[in-house]
């Protein structure tokens, strides 16, 4: 088997979004799974729209999710002389030509074609022009598209695709200022980089016949193509920023783990048996572009949150502390190692993101300022207050390093007073945490410690 070489080639006109990252992941997995090469190419030939910040954000996103590319990043803006050389080659071989049609003439032609209910297109009028070029017109360069031929390629996702060359006009490969067009620079770079397989969004499917014309004109080897359907929202519409089509780094800021995001995106448009959870190693072992789906996939926040919660639960306390560094939350320095482990173990089971985990740390470690009203109103204060006073005395005798002892102390009150567990547990929870839900009470007592627990109960009794 020949060496698999893939690439990801974004334009730095905006930040890397979720669909782009998925394309990068597919190309990365295919190359790495076959001990091949994976390159990053920045398609920055549109000098008026390029953004250095956007290019850097793409690189930053790659670093975050762990997509390592081979060699140096290739910037197309540094390769204009190479493209110029290949355009001249086509001109010299009479496979391309200068077109002197002005914009006004082209607009007028299109209006005439529309009036005749024809598809607007250039009419190839300068294809075999031998006369004197009109003055004052900076020409574009057009490729001579072979006529009366059928372009056939077998797309790895779409199947066999056929296009008659008569449906294509002689499209532009160099603008009047000499800069090359997208379709031209793509095929030159893919050929010179030795790209064997192109996995990209199916919005590029219509470009492929034109690119094949150029591959053939320059006698370049045509790569294999895989055109992946776009990602839709849960209503079946094009993904918007509100539904997930946002800067990849926003997901890091929201507290998603890179492992969860890669797993989630790899499964959007690709499947392997009924398996949902994949480590990077498992993805490398299982991924094959032949298994890419031909139908659009749907972005699901519920699914992403479920996956993220799974990966969150599998992090150790030390790993979580490292991951939590970008987020602000209560000081943890007063907790001993056992309390810290217990805090993170208890809360990671109840959190879907790192951001949510940070908020829950605050909720536990910050003494309640007020108490959940609907729970407080239901309390029988005449019964509750004596119970908490008695429990305070019991806590002074308990070893707070022993969760079982803390649990026994609570059950002792319930048994001695012959009351239902909720009659005591609910007010105790309110006193410690300020609300009716949250982590277990023995965990809360253990994490808070004797001094803080007694302080919170005393404050509640005075409220």
Curated annotation (Swiss-Prot):
Reactions it catalyzes: tRNA(Glu) + L-glutamate + ATP = L-glutamyl-tRNA(Glu) + AMP + diphosphate
Location of this chain's protein in the cell: Cytoplasm
EC number: 6.1.1.17
Record keywords: Aminoacyl-tRNA synthetase, ATP-binding, Cytoplasm, Ligase, Nucleotide-binding, Protein biosynthesis
InterPro entries, alphabetized: aa-tRNA-synth_I_cd-bd, aa-tRNA-synth_I_codon-bd_sub2, aa-tRNA-synth_I_CS, aa_tRNA-synth_I_cd-bd_sf, Glu-tRNA-ligase_bac/mito, Glu/Gln-tRNA-synth, Glu/Gln-tRNA-synth_Ib_cat-dom, GluQ/Sye
Chief location: cytoplasm
Family: Belongs to the class-I aminoacyl-tRNA synthetase family. Glutamate--tRNA ligase type 1 subfamily.
Name this protein carries in UniProt: Glutamate--tRNA ligase 1
Protein species of origin: Helicobacter pylori (strain HPAG1)
């Amino acid at each position: 088997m020949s060496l698999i070489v893939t690439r990801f080639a974004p334009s730095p006109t905006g930040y890397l979004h979720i669909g782009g990252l998925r394309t990068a992941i597919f190309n990365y997995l295919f190359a790495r799974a076959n001990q091949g090469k994976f390159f990053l190419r920045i398609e920055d030939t549109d000098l008026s729209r390029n953004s250095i910040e956007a290019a850097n954000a793409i690189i930053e996103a790659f670093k975050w999710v762990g997509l390592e590319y081979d060699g140096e990043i290739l910037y197309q803006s540094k390769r204009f002389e190479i493209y110029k050389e290949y355009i001249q080659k086509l001109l010299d071989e009479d496979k391309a030509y200068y077109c002197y049609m002005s914009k006004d003439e082209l607009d007028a032609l299109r209006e005439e074609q529309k009036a005749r209910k024809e598809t607007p297109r250039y009419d190839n009028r300068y294809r075999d022009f031998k006369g004197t070029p009109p003055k004052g017109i900076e020409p574009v360069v057009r490729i001579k598209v072979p006529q009366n031929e059928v372009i056939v390629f077998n797309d790895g996702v779409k199947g066999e695709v056929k296009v008659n060359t008569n449906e294509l006009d002689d499209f532009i490969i160099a603008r009047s200022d000499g800069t090359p067009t997208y379709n031209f620079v793509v095929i030159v770079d893919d050929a010179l980089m030795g790209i064997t397989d192109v996995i990209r969004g199916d919005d590029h499917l219509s470009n492929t016949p034109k690119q094949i014309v150029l591959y053939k004109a320059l006698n370049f080897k045509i790569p294999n193509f895989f055109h992946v359907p776009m990602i839709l929202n849960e209503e079946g519409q094009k993904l918007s920023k509100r539904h997930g089509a946002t800067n990849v780094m926003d997901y890091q800021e929201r507290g998603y783990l890179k492992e969860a995001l890669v797993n989630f995106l790899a499964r959007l448009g690709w499947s392997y048996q009924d398996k949902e959870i994949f480590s990077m190693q498992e993805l490398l072992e299982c991924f094959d572009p032949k298994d890419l789906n031909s139908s659009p996939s749907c972005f699901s926040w519920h699914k992403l949150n479920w996956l993220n919660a799974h990966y969150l639960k599998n992090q150790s306390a030390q790993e979580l502390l490292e991951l939590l560094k970008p987020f602000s939350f209560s000081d943890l320095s007063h907790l001993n190692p056992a309390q810290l482990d217990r805090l993170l173990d208890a809360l990671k089971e109840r959190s879907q993101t790192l951001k949510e985990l940070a908020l829950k740390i605050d909720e536990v470690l910050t003494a309640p300022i007020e108490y959940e009203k609907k729970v407080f109103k239901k309390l029988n204060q005449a019964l509750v207050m004596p119970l908490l006073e008695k429990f305070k005395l019991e806590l002074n005798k308990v070893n707070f390093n022993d969760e079982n002892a803390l649990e026994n102390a609570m059950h002792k009150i319930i048994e001695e007073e012959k009351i239902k567990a909720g009659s005591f547990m609910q007010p105790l929870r309110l006193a410690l945490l300020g609300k009716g839900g949250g982590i277990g009470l023995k965990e809360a007592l253990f994490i808070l410690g004797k001094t803080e627990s007694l302080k919170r109960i005393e404050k509640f009794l005075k409220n």
